[in-house]
Every structure is written in C-alpha cells, then in structure tokens.
C-alpha cells in the first residue's frame, strides 16, 4: 500500500531528525554549560537551557548525520543513486558541517588548550580530505575521513572541557568537575 509506505517514510524521517537533533542539543548543552549555582543546582526557568550552544550542537549533529549518511549511500550503491548521493555530499557538506565546526571552535576559543587545538586542526584536515575524496569519487576515503573528523572533533570537545564534566555558566567555580563528580 502506497499510503502505508509514505506514512512510515515520514515517521522514520521525522524521528531520525528528532533523535539526531536531541542528542546533539544535549551534547552541546553539557559541553558549553548550564546555569549551575554554588550548591550544584540548576537555576533559571524551564527554558534556561535554551542557548546558542544547544542550537549548534543539535544542528551540528543533524548536519554530520546527513553528510555521513550521504557518504555511506554513495559508498554502498551504484549508478544514479551513487552519483546523486556523492553530488549532494560535495555540494552540501560545507554548509551542513558548519554548525559542528562552529561548536568545536567556540569551545576551543573559550576553554581550549594545546591538545584540543591539535585535535581541532586534525579534524579539519580529515574533513577536507573527506570532501576532496568525495569530489574525486573516492567514497571509501570520504566515509573514513568523515569518521576521523568525528573522532577528532569529539576529542577536541572533551579535551577543551577537561576537567569539567558540566560547566557552570554562572561562575566557573560552580562547575561540576571530574574531582567533585566522583566524590
């Protein structure tokens, strides 16, 4: 039944988008911080968590998921589908990956260190290799490059946050750190 297929395609698309947006938003939130007071309590209203880092994290995760999905489709198919996936990847990757790059750079500029900057540089090199590879029809290298980009991007985020587990946007002294989270 065509209606059944269409409805399930819509449900799958909307839920996939929603999950990617939610996971990215939560990662953006925990990496850039919450308004935590000296007692370790979150303060502010119900929407105190809504911020630019949450938006960057959500859109960054959605964008990366789309780009990595396009690379996978281009890698695993032939013919017109492969060409369309590769062409869409090459055309849209710079735009779709911009939020995740902005998120990593925002962290590096605020709390980064030498290791986080090195990871960021390696992530940028990996994504450039991935884009050039996709442009040249080397989908396997593009997929691998995007995977390396994700790994170094995540390392950049976590090394820039260290030793914080959950930064406070009110005062850095109120942040939840590895030391006080373990006790």
Positions of predicted regions on the chain:
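C-terminal active-site-capping segments
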Residues: 161
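Long, contiguous internal "core" modules enriched in hydrophobic/ aromatic residues
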Residues: 2-142, 156
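Proteins with a high burden of low-complexity, intrinsically disordered sequence enriched in S/T/G/P/A and R
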Residues: 1-5, 180-183
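Short, membrane-exposed interhelical loops at transmembrane-helix boundaries
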Residues: 166-183
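Central hydrophobic cores of alpha-helical transmembrane segments
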Residues: 144-152
């Amino acid at each position: 039944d065509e209606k059944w297929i269409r409805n399930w395609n819509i449900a799958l698309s909307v839920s996939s988008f929603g999950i990617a947006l939610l996971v990215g938003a939560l990662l953006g939130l925990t990496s850039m911080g919450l308004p935590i007071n000296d007692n370790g309590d979150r303060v502010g209203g119900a929407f105190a968590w809504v911020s630019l880092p949450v938006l960057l994290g959500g859109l960054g995760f959605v964008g990366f998921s789309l780009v990595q999905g396009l690379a996978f489709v281009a890698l695993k198919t032939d013919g017109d589908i492969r060409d369309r996936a590769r062409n869409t990847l090459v055309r849209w990757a710079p735009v779709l990956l911009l939020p995740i790059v902005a998120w990593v750079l925002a962290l590096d500029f605020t709390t980064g260190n030498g290791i986080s900057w090195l990871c960021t540089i390696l992530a940028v090199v990996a994504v450039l290799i991935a884009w050039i590879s996709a442009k040249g029809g080397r989908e396997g290298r593009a997929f691998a490059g995007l995977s390396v980009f994700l790994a170094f991007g995540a390392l950049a985020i976590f090394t820039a946050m260290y030793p914080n587990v959950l930064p406070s946007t009110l005062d850095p002294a109120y942040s939840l750190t590895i030391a006080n989270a373990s006790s």
